[in-house]
Amino acid sequence: MLKREMKPESDRPRKVRFRIASSHSGRVLKEVYEDGQPSGSLDSECASICGIDGLGDSDGQQNGHIESEGDENENDQDSLLVLARAASEKGFGTRRVNILSKNGTVRGVKYKVSAGQALFNNLTKVLQQPSTDLEFDRVVIYTTCLRVVRTTFERCELVRKIFQNHRVKFEEKNIALNGEYGKELDERCRRVSEAPSLPVVFIDGHYLGGAEKILSMNESGELQDILTKIERVQHPHECPSCGGFGFLPCSVCHGSKMSMFRNCFTDSFKALKCTACNENGLQRCKNCAG
């Protein structure tokens, strides 16, 4: 039987407990073995520049890279260097942790998903803030031109004719032509704790009511008193460009919603949509908007 030669203890490779690496270049600066004895300075010049020679275990976790090696899989799997920065990311309050390989290449970023979620949550809160646009001496009517529900369409026509008979200037927002008007109506009705049932009238930025309320105020003469400060229209006429709808087909995609970068030779751009118009392929009429 062959006897295995016993290697002296000094020649056995010592297992590394952790390594301290530079946060900029990824260069290993110091190694600490399982027996507690640190190795010699691997890069004294870089260590002196970075100021990491006197770091302990806790300081190394905050200002440098910590590399841990498993006892069983240290030869099969690549060891990962984890950079834990003490400075928290601005606006998120979480540490940015880069997962690096031995040669310093970035293999992943911890807390990236949570940071992205926090970013989009903050953007949503900003976009949901109430509008600061003033509506002094303005009449805004939210209507629809869809005739799926006949009673709703007839009430919208009734309210429109009432304000036309008073010869006042009003702005009609048709939620069937622009989905943003529907979101705006839901937000404004939510502030006043009212159900968004079309049509809805706002005067001077204040909620006035629906078709029944406008009809009763018109019959009692109260509506005429409210409209005394609203701008009058002596000769009402429809816009020759849009016919009074306030929207025109998109001048870029002509209402098809197809992007100008899309072609018929490949399917890679199938999901691209035109960004110059709304979801219905319409643009605001420049004559009415002006």
From Swiss-Prot:
SUPFAM superfamilies: Thioredoxin-like. GO terms for biological process: auditory receptor cell stereocilium organization; calcium ion transmembrane transport; cochlea development; establishment of localization in cell; exocytosis; inner ear receptor cell development; inner ear receptor cell stereocilium organization; plasma membrane organization. The keyword Transferase does not apply. Keywords: Cell projection, Cilium, Deafness, Disease variant, Hearing, Non-syndromic deafness. Signal peptide: none annotated. Gene3D superfamilies: Glutaredoxin. GO terms for cellular component: kinocilium; microvillus; stereocilium. InterPro entries: Glutaredoxin, GRXCR1, Thioredoxin-like_sf. It is found in: Cell projection, Stereocilium; Cell projection, Microvillus; Cell projection, Kinocilium. The keyword Transport does not apply. Expressed at low levels in adult lung, brain and duodenum with moderate levels in testis. Highly expressed in fetal cochlea. Residues 127-234 form the Glutaredoxin domain. It is linked to Deafness, autosomal recessive, 25: A form of non-syndromic sensorineural deafness characterized by moderate to severe or profound hearing loss which is progressive in some individuals but not in others. Speech development is impaired in some but not all affected individuals, and vestibular dysfunction is observed in some affected individuals. Sensorineural deafness results from damage to the neural receptors of the inner ear, the nerve pathways to the brain, or the area of the brain that receives sound information. May play a role in actin filament architecture in developing stereocilia of sensory cells. Belongs to the GRXCR1 family. PANTHER family: GLUTAREDOXIN DOMAIN-CONTAINING CYSTEINE-RICH PROTEIN 1. This is Glutaredoxin domain-containing cysteine-rich protein 1. It comes from Homo sapiens (Human). The gene is GRXCR1.
